[in-house]
Amino acid sequence: MTTEKRQILVTAALPYANGPIHLGHMVEHIQADIWVRFQRLKGNDCLFICGEDAHGTAIMITAQKQGLPPEALVAKMHKEHARDLGGFLIEYDNFYTTHSPENRELAELIYTRLKDKGDIFAKTISQAYDPVKEIFLPDRFIRGTCPRCGAKDQYGDVCEVCGATYSPTELIDPVSALSGAKPIEKNSEHFFFSLNRYTQLLKKWIDAGHLQPQVANKLKEWFSEDLKPWDISRDAPYFGFEIPHAANKYFYVWLDAPIGYMASLKNLSKQRPSVNFDAYWKEGSQTELYHFVGKDIVYFHALFWPAMLSGAGFRLPTAIYVHGYLTVNGQKMSKSRGTFITAHHYLDHLSPEYLRYYYAAKLSAQVEDIDLNLDDFIQRVNADLIGKYVNLASRCAGFITKNFGGKLANELPELDLYESFLQTEQTITDYYESLNYSKAVRVIMSLADRANQYIDAKKPWALAKEINQEAQVQAVCTQGLNLFKILTTYLKPILPVTAKKVEQFLNCDELNFANLKTPLLDHSVNPFEPLMQRLLPETAAQLTHE
């Protein structure tokens, strides 16, 4: 019986083009990449897209400070971000940019459709203005006290403590982040999206299970009051797309940023004719669409975005998967403590697969923060990957190469043990599918323990010294390497480079779930090369000091 291939589109949140990617960003990109690789390993068609979030006053000001046009800054950061994501083995089909003709075209299309439906209206508002810099202040360039929970030093549009969104004029004791001056009020006409028109649609969509229960419950709190209209415009000077037929008005970065997912696929469809844009985005599409995002941008993705898509006649996401923040050694990342670790700095010192594994061992389907404890990181990598997983192969491979010319036995001596490893496939794939990677890793490592216990019990090193035990040595090591093959298939979404090395060592086809059950018997393997290096205690110091 053949199961029909699923057609899946996966996105990760777009990194912002005014700073480097750090290990906090990597939680999401690794989480999404593991899921995509798992789907492909299962034989599903899975496209994976992302891109540079390129617009906003922050980009404009950063570019000015660096003496660059905004376009040049975006191009530079796009190159750096693509390098770092690639370094962590994040396998995007397209890593594009929101500053693109496709994104402009789609933003204008969605805006025009919403306007034609009567969902857009103009209103004169009082806005924060920096009298020193002579610029309207974007939300992120105003700091003050949250009007909802009273947390100090919060952004002008969203509170990182309670998650409230608000307008900058509601902030208590605001100051300009550009000059330190107290902003003055200045009137300006802005365009608003009538989000409240979509209240029932959003309630129904949230109730239908498209979000984790924690996220859905949090969002339902916002419906206790009417949803407020969303300000989708900004005044010049601004780096972004001009609003059609509105002089000196630009789309707010959060309007065109999620449309960047669509633009990235549209651009990919031009490069790859087999990719049909409408098949993934048209209303009523039978394909699957998943967004991986952090908990700080849930409001934009789970309220504004579905409403915009619905109003403009596009499909809604199948699910939005939300993750928590990263802490390092139990605390928020900090430059002064040396725990603000950029992706590039990490890659200068260590294999990306160590961090991919450590994150996988911590990630669940819950919206929980995860902690990168550097001592635990070293211990976990050494104990699990080196001590259990790689050790299994290195204990068996030498005998096969040296004593049997690389030839495996023609049968397995312990078929029941082999079958028991195969019987965990459904459990492990269910854990991957549901984003419970930590549970998958736990099962896989318990299998690695059992495989090593088998080798410990059979003692091929002792058998090799006995007379007439050659066949038994070959059989035991063949069993061990076939168990190692199963473990590698299970770990392949997390450790893609190591899996490739194992395929070369085992001299076999690409490992996947379709060929999982087939053992390698009467088969020649290549000489074993070391797969990973043990981490030294000074690793933590290398990562936390430039």
Curated annotation (Swiss-Prot):
NCBIfam families: metG, PRK00133.1. This is Methionine--tRNA ligase. One of its GO terms (cellular component) is cytosol. InterPro entries: aa-tRNA-synth_I_CS (IPR001412), Anticodon_Met (IPR041872), Met-tRNA_ligase_1 (IPR023458), Met-tRNA_synth (IPR014758), Methionyl/Leucyl_tRNA_Synth (IPR015413), MetRS_core (IPR033911), MetRS_Zn (IPR029038), Rossmann-like_a/b/a_fold (IPR014729). The gene is metG. The keyword Aminoacyl-tRNA synthetase applies. PANTHER family: METHIONINE--TRNA LIGASE (PTHR45765), METHIONINE--TRNA LIGASE, CYTOPLASMIC (PTHR45765:SF1). It holds the Pfam family tRNA-synt_1g. A motif ('HIGH' region) lies at residues 15-25. Binds 1 zinc ion per subunit. It catalyses: tRNA(Met) + L-methionine + ATP = L-methionyl-tRNA(Met) + AMP + diphosphate. A motif ('KMSKS' region) lies at residues 332-336.
